[in-house]
């Protein structure tokens, strides 16, 4: 089960659902709110540091005026963050509320396990 952020932050319903699905799928241990960049304060919602794999949960995509991830500048900032992560060797799986399903999470957990095996070769 992923360790939760210790700073008393509110854990979203989307994050709680992800944790349940990830646990059921037998996914490897994750760190919540992992700061991955050496100079920026960017964080991944969940990360497997040893495999450099991360989960991003994009809530609010279907709100009438869009959430942060669906607005112009939010999308621009997300792109900047994801490019920087790729430059550092990270792989990222993104989920919205609609695509956070047991099947999708199970497939992602399998990909994480394969990435962990590749890193140990």
Question: What residue ranges belong to the model's regions?
Answer:
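Nucleic-acid endo/exonuclease domains
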Residues: 1-121
């Amino acid at each position: 089960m992923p360790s939760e952020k210790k700073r008393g932050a509110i854990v979203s319903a989307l994050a709680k659902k992800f944790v349940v699905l990830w646990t059921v799928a037998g996914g490897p241990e994750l760190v919540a709110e992992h700061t991955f960049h050496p100079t920026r304060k960017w964080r991944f919602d969940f990360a497997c540091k040893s495999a450099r794999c991360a989960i991003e949960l994009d809530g609010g995509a279907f709100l009438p005026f869009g959430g942060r991830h669906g607005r112009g500048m939010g999308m621009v900032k997300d792109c900047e963050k994801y490019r920087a992560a790729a430059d550092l060797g990270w792989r990222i799986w993104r989920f919205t509320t609609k695509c956070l399903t047991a099947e999708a999470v199970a497939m992602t957990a399998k990909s994480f396990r394969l990435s962990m095996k590749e890193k140990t070769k």
